[in-house]
A protein has these predicted regions:
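Intrinsically disordered, low-complexity regulatory segments in ankyrin-centric signaling systems
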Residues: 4, 17-44, 54-57, 61, ...
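Hydrophobic h-region of N-terminal signal peptides that target proteins for export
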Residues: 10-17
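Ankyrin repeat A-helix N-terminal signature
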Residues: 28-34, 62-68, 94-100, 127-133, ...
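Ankyrin repeat structural motif
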Residues: 34-42, 68-76, 100-108, 133-141, ...
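Ankyrin-repeat inter-repeat connecting loop/turn
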Residues: 48-49, 82, 114, 147
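Ankyrin-repeat boundary/linker signal
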Residues: 52, 84-85, 117, 150
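Leucine-rich solenoid repeat scaffolds
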Residues: 147-175
């Protein structure tokens, strides 16, 4: 019995070591890898960058949430659906939540739709308003984010702005 237990432990150790040596999967690479690593994965499987994790995230969404700018920029230019919607929204929503104006611009330049809401009906513009990120609000409005879209509670971006009491944010939405 001891020999079998020892054999199982050695086998599991070898498997774990092999997995560690083999590198990161596409989702780990999206979070904290490099463009070169992403290209290596893509060379093995062209569609891997369009994968969806068990939690419902694409590599692009994960790269945006983690602030892995170079990988996110690469993915934004190469994925099939830049507007893929997870249970937590799109890659653009992730950039808005993170307050990453540069990433939002890259996504918008690559045809990200600023009017796709998450399951709660919240759009990237509403996130930008809630975080009082005036530069991001301006950018989203430049790319035709809807000022009149209502979330599931019937509130518009201006309603959210009124709650912040930030006059600059309110004025951006009134003009």
């Amino acid at each position: 019995m001891k020999k079998i237990t020892l054999l199982i432990i050695l086998l599991l150790s070898a498997v774990c070591h092999a997995q560690m040596k083999s590198g990161k999967d596409v989702f780990d690479t999206a979070r904290y890898g490099t463009v070169a690593e992403m290209k290596q994965l893509e060379a093995k499987d062209k569609n891997i960058i369009n994968s969806v994790s068990p939690m419902g995230f694409t590599p692009l969404i994960l790269a945006c949430y983690r602030g892995n700018t170079e990988v996110a920029e690469y993915l934004a230019k190469h994925v099939k659906d830049i507007n893929y919607k997870s249970d937590n929204g799109t890659a653009l929503a992730a950039a808005a939540v993170k307050g990453d104006i540069n990433m939002a611009k890259v996504l918008l330049e690559n045809k990200a739709d600023p009017n796709i809401a998450d399951p709660l009906g919240v759009t990237p513009l509403v996130y930008a308003v809630q975080f009082e990120n005036t530069e991001l609000i301006k950018l989203l409005l430049e790319y035709k984010a809807s000022k009149t879209y209502k979330d599931k509670e019937g509130r518009t971006p201006l309603d959210h702005a009124d709650f912040t009491k930030n006059q600059e944010v309110i004025n951006l939405l009134k003009n």
